[in-house]
C-alpha cells in the first residue's frame, strides 16, 4: 500500500487506529484555539489532496470549529407561553460543514472556498478543515487545473451553495426518482424538495 492508502485506512475508523489517541491530544489545544484558524498544512493529507489541495502558493488551509446540535434561535423578549416561543426543534437547513465553510469565507474575504473535510468532533463541537484558494495569485491563474476559480461566476461560491457541502445540503447529489423537486432549486419548487 502507498502512503496515502495507509492514512486513509487509519482515518476510516479513527477510534480503532492510532488516530484516536492523536485526536484526543490535539483537541485539547483545538478547544483553546480561535474558531477560525489558519494552519500550516492539512491534518488529513490524503483527503485534502483528493479534494484538490496542492502544496503550492495560493492555497490556504483553515481549521474551523462549529457548535454541534440544532440551531440556537434568539429568545423572544415579549410575553408568550413557552411552547409558542419557537426555541426548540428547529434544525438549520444547512449542514454544519457548510456553516464551517461560510465561517472561513467570512474570515478571509479575499479567498474562495474550494472544498472541506471533517477532522474531529467531541460532545460540543465539530472541526472541519477548509481548503481555500487565492483567485488573484499568479500561480493559481497560471495553473489550468484551478484557474477556473478566478472566474466571475465563482465569486462568493460558498454563499451560493456551489461547494460540495452546499450541493449536498441542497439535494443536488441526488438523481432520478425522488429528486424531481430539487432542480433547479428548492425555492423554485416552493420548498417541496426538502
Curated annotation (Swiss-Prot):
An example molecular function term from Gene Ontology annotations: RNA binding
Keyword presence, Ribonucleoprotein: yes
Disulfide bonds: none
Organism: Thermococcus kodakarensis (strain ATCC BAA-918 / JCM 12380 / KOD1) (Pyrococcus kodakaraensis (strain KOD1))
Quaternary assembly: Part of the 50S ribosomal subunit.
Protein name: Large ribosomal subunit protein eL15
Keywords carried by this UniProt record: Ribonucleoprotein, Ribosomal protein
Family matches, as SUPFAM superfamilies: Ribosomal proteins S24e, L23 and L15e
Signal peptide residue numbers: none
Domain of life the protein comes from: Archaea
Keyword Cell inner membrane annotated: no
Family under the similarity heading: Belongs to the eukaryotic ribosomal protein eL15 family.
Record-linked SMART domains: Ribosomal_L15e (SM01384)
GO BP annotations listed: cytoplasmic translation
Taxonomic placement: Archaea, Methanobacteriati, Methanobacteriota, Thermococci, Thermococcales
Region (Disordered) residue spans: 168-194
Gene3D superfamilies: Ribosomal protein l15e (3.40.1120.10)
Amino acid at each position: 500500500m502507498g502512503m496515502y492508502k495507509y492514512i486513509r485506512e487509519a482515518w476510516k475508523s479513527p477510534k480503532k487506529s492510532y488516530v484516536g489517541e492523536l485526536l484526543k491530544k490535539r483537541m485539547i489545544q483545538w478547544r483553546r484555539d480561535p474558531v477560525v484558524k489558519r494552519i500550516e498544512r492539512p491534518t488529513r493529507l490524503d483527503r485534502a489532496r483528493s479534494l484538490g489541495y496542492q502544496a503550492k502558493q495560493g492555497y490556504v488551509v483553515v481549521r474551523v470549529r462549529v457548535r454541534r446540535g440544532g440551531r440556537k434561535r434568539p429568545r423572544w423578549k415579549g410575553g408568550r407561553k413557552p411552547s409558542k416561543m419557537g426555541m426548540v426543534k428547529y434544525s438549520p437547513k444547512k449542514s454544519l460543514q457548510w456553516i464551517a465553510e461560510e465561517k472561513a469565507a467570512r474570515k478571509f474575504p479575499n479567498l474562495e472556498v474550494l472544498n472541506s473535510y471533517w477532522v474531529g468532533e467531541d460532545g460540543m463541537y465539530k472541526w472541519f478543515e477548509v481548503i481555500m484558494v487565492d483567485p488573484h495569485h499568479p500561480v493559481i491563474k497560471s495553473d489550468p487545473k484551478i484557474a477556473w476559480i478566478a472566474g466571475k461566476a465563482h465569486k462568493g461560491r460558498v454563499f451560493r451553495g456551489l461547494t460540495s457541502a452546499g450541493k449536498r445540503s441542497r439535494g443536488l447529489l441526488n438523481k432520478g426518482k425522488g429528486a424531481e423537486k430539487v432542480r433547479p432549486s428548492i425555492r423554485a419548487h416552493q420548498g417541496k424538495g426538502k
